[in-house]
Amino acid sequence: MSWQTILAIGSGGFIGAVLRAYFNGIISHKMPHDIPFGTLGVNLVGSFIMGILIAYFMYSTIFSLHVKSFLSTGVLGALTTYSTFAIESFLLLNSGHIALALANISLNAFGSILMAGGGFYIIKLSLRA
């Protein structure tokens, strides 16, 4: 990976992280707190934008590798890693790999929740010791 690509991803990541915090704060402030609507909002919007970008990247040659890296891995990767999960799952479905897509969806959803809980409880138990 070239230093230009690394710089593109890093600067895009900075922008995406700031956007995530900003929009998450606005949405969370205005919506009820029973469901984390801020996170849901950035995940849904980020996934939609990722779909748009991937279509442009696949069917157009107007974007350089650095612009692609900046927008997809950088901005959207920091805005929401959910957009990557969404487009990878969609591409599996779109290519007819239904079982792989369902496995990917299940493993990501349930595996991430289990790992988050596992990490939480490891620290919780270690702080009690």
Curated annotation (Swiss-Prot):
Q: Name one GO cellular component term.
A: plasma membrane
Reaction(s) catalysed (UniProt annotation): fluoride(in) = fluoride(out)
Name a biological process GO annotation. Answer: cellular detoxification of fluoride
Q: How is its activity regulated?
A: Na(+) is not transported, but it plays an essential structural role and its presence is essential for fluoride channel function.
Which residue windows are transmembrane per the record? 6-26, 35-55, 73-93, 98-118
Positions that bind Na(+): G77, T80
Q: Which GO terms describe its molecular function?
A: fluoride channel activity; metal ion binding
- Alphabetical UniProt keywords: Cell inner membrane, Cell membrane, Ion channel, Ion transport, Membrane, Metal-binding, Sodium, Transmembrane, Transmembrane helix, Transport
Q: Where in or outside the cell is it found?
A: Cell inner membrane
Q: Does the keyword Transcription apply?
A: no
* Membrane-related topology note: Multi-pass membrane protein
Per the record's keyword annotation, is Electron transport included, yes or no? Answer: no
- Alphabetical list of Pfam families matching this protein: CRCB
Primary location group? membrane
Q: Show the NCBIfam families listed in the entry.
A: crcB
Its annotated function is as follows: Fluoride-specific ion channel. Important for reducing fluoride concentration in the cell, thus reducing its toxicity.
The similarity annotation says:
Belongs to the fluoride channel Fluc/FEX (TC 1.A.43) family.
> Which PANTHER family does the annotation name?
FLUORIDE EXPORT PROTEIN 1-RELATED
Q: What is this protein called?
A: Fluoride-specific ion channel FluC
Q: What is the lineage of its organism?
A: Bacteria, Pseudomonadati, Campylobacterota, Epsilonproteobacteria, Campylobacterales
Q: Gene encoding this chain?
A: fluC
